[in-house]
């Protein structure tokens, strides 16, 4: 029999309640929206607080109580009255808790964030399904750009980003997963730059993500719009680096190790690779694990089946141009499944 969303959420809830019991935590309060949505199984945009005692309670504002009762019927819904009520007897909080809330806590407490982070790093079947859908949506936008490059060359960056975000919205994205990076020319030499009213020219970098039912995608493509040998050389080096990473991406490799492998592949160009190789994706577009050579030994993570990560090598030539190619992957025991499937241009 197919599991309902309530069955899936109850499994997550039971795992967290067992953790609380093992740690001697009697009452945990969760305020971070992404952590709440993890236990809800759906995107809930309104104010809410999730409280775990012997069972979980979702506190919402008066305006949202009817909606919450209809959509989250596997939880008891309560109307928010006061922070004193929420935190009374609380002994488990997130590390992100603002200092202003501490005045409501009258006993020693433990940090629960590491457990939630550990749970969220390994995606279950329902999460993978939603991430795949988000990736499918951003693929549609990337493929539109690829198939309409002649038209794109006549647009400004503002006009193109509007078209891209419209396509994603039309196909079910709640919102962009982050501020869309749609830039051309010298601005591509900055890993993170915002679109402007400039006309698209020479080289185009598109880094976008969709959000479907709260779950994110992340994909980058670079398009060469003129015949330039240096651009081709750098582009193909980045493309090959991505393939090198794919050869090593599987359960058992460490986050730091796979970054270092790509950095060494770049050889004389590795100083131009100025960011980490990738990051986890789920309810947040940037979450654990980080694939970075800067991780300390106690921060390094062994990749496991069920993790969803990006691989995004890039090289950036100051005052000239930059190239980045990024895809989204589900880690498996003996390899991976590529979740983003938009075509990659070859030059």
Swiss-Prot record:
Its cofactor is Mn(2+). One of its GO terms (molecular function) is metalloaminopeptidase activity. Binds 2 manganese ions per subunit. InterPro entries: Creatin/AminoP/Spt16_N (IPR029149), Creatinase/aminopeptidase-like (IPR036005), Creatinase_N (IPR000587), Pept_M24 (IPR000994), Pept_M24_MAP (IPR001714), Peptidase_M24B (IPR050659), Peptidase_M24B_aminopep-P_CS (IPR001131). Its EC number is 3.4.-.-. Signal peptide: none annotated. Mn(2+) 1 binds at residues 218, 279, 312, 326. Belongs to the peptidase M24B family. This is Uncharacterized peptidase MJ0806.
